[in-house]
Amino acid sequence: NSKETWKAFNLLNKFYKGSKLLKFTKPKQINKWEMIPFWDCKKAELRNSKNELIVSKKKNNLSVYSFAPKINKEVDFKTLKKHILTDSKRPSATIFHFRNQYRHWNPEWGFSLPYNLFKKLDKKETYKINIESNFKKNKGFLQSEYLKKGRKKETYILIGHFDHPNQVNDGLAGVIAAYETIKRLKKIKTKYSYLAF
């Protein structure tokens, strides 16, 4: 739930005529799920003590933990290491950190670094953390739906999501597949109804 997500929903809605934007404004709890707050991250950078940029959200959205809270401080390598996601088995990969999306009431700051970059960090160095972000609980939550009515009310639901930034196969592809299915079903008569959500 961020400005990038809202932009994606608005683009989706413009492209698929007849789809509908849904805005939920009151924070809700359904079973154990709580409506996720709007996260506005203007900047996220990790620099060394010489002020040299190591990673930034501007270069790669996956570099910062999603829903990372605001922080601006200098830390030693031992502290930084606790807030780094990396994988030696995928040395070039910037891995998506999603924990905060499911525990947004207790977010942690951090960065995702390719292992090849992580192993070059100097253990004796200090590092500058600057994440400019805030949470807006009352901004609401945006969603979209695209309905193809059939003769019956019984509905098949096709679900996709935009909550994984910069990842086509785990977000965008599912959304587009669902909406394309509805778009094509609208050209024929169907017994059942179909909803992309």
Could you describe each region identified by the protein language model?
Residues 1-197:
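N-terminal hydrophobic/helix-forming segments and targeting peptides
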